[in-house]
């Protein structure tokens, strides 16, 4: 049986990160999606193109996605044949995240609707078009999913994670002293261990 993993990186990440996960995913080919825009209506075409290319060549397709990459994956591939997904610090509710950012920026939806875009002090540009797109394109996600979450994640709330877990076929692993971006030696070792276990369970199904 031929198996492949599609890897979708997060903001500021790289498709080359897929290489560092190969050691955790023995028996799988792995391909990273090289994208640089962060608008779902653009990224979806790149993700769909890669999926379409590998669909006929592999018996099973798995996903690994990081942060906003999880949102892009769910939006694009929700109706596709995915055996299992592994999400790292995932954006699971994009509308909730945008509304949180609106609050953090001390502006209102009305302000955003009138201005179209609002830059923030924390480096993100709020977009009314983006918020409308998210609301007009709800996601139905039925893929078995493993989630790795950090207790000190300053972007995604535990409440959002727990809500997703309760409404989906998903399992949660938490590194309590981890951060949204897993980057220290300790955090990366935890991530590697989690991924190896999740892949082993997956591949035995």
Give residue spans per PLM region.
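Short, surface-exposed "cap/lid" segments of acyl-processing enzymes
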Residues: 1-39
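Short coil/turn segments at beta-strand junctions that form active-site/ligand-binding loops
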Residues: 2-3, 58-60, 83, 143-144
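Short, surface-exposed alpha-helical segments at coil->helix boundaries
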Residues: 15-22, 44, 157-162
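Catalytic nucleophile-loop/oxyanion-hole region of alpha/beta-hydrolase
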Residues: 32-57
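Short beta-strand immediately N-terminal to the catalytic nucleophile in serine-hydrolase-like folds
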Residues: 60-65, 88
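Gly/Ala-rich beta-loop-alpha elbow adjacent to hydrolase catalytic centers
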Residues: 64-73
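Aromatic pocket-lining residues of Rossmann-like dinucleotide-binding sites
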Residues: 76-80
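The alpha/beta-hydrolase serine catalytic core
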Residues: 81-205
């Amino acid at each position: 049986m031929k198996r492949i993993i599609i890897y979708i990186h997060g903001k500021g990440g790289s498709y080359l990160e897929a290489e560092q996960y190969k050691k955790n995913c023995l028996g799988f080919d792995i391909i990273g999606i090289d994208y640089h825009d962060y608008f779902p209506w653009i990224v979806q075409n790149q993700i769909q193109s890669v999926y379409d290319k590998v669909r006929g060549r592999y018996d099973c397709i798995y996903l690994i996605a990081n942060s906003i990459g999880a949102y892009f994956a769910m939006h694009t591939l929700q109706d596709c044949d995915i055996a299992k997904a592994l999400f790292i610090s995932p954006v699971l509710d994009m509308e909730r995240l945008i509304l949180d950012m609106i609050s953090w920026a001390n502006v209102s939806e009305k302000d955003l609707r009138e201005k179209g875009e609002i830059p923030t002090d924390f480096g993100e540009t709020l977009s009314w078009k983006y918020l409308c797109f998210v609301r007009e394109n709800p996601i139905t996600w039925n893929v078995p999913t493993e989630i790795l979450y950090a207790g000190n994640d300053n972007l995604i709330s535990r409440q959002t994670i727990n809500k997703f877990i309760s409404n989906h076929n998903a399992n949660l692993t938490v590194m309590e002293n981890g951060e949204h971006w897993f980057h220290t030696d300790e955090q990366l070792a935890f991530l590697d261990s989690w991924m190896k276990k999740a892949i082993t369970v997956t591949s035995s199904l």
